[in-house]
């Protein structure tokens, strides 16, 4: 089961980052359905086109944000909430279809990643709330 499927099955929040608009467009239909089935989502990407994701296709419980020109832009992150706190995948896009990263169920590590994203983006991603 992938992280997104876990979020849907367990009705828990989801954080997903995409390096480029093209990578989001590849999964856009799938994500449009996922966002309707979870309590909250943060979708962050190197989005340059403000009309990439039509507002009427996104539930009010979802936040779509651009991380263009930040240190998050080259990151592929997918996080959800498990019984012991957040868990997920954190990877850096090295180019040429190569990534460097890790999957962890250690909530302290994921919470540190979320803190960096919150500080960089000046937002509040909080998996304690549903």
Language model: regions and residue ranges:
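PLD/PLD-like phosphodiesterase catalytic module centered on the HKD motif
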Residues: 1-130
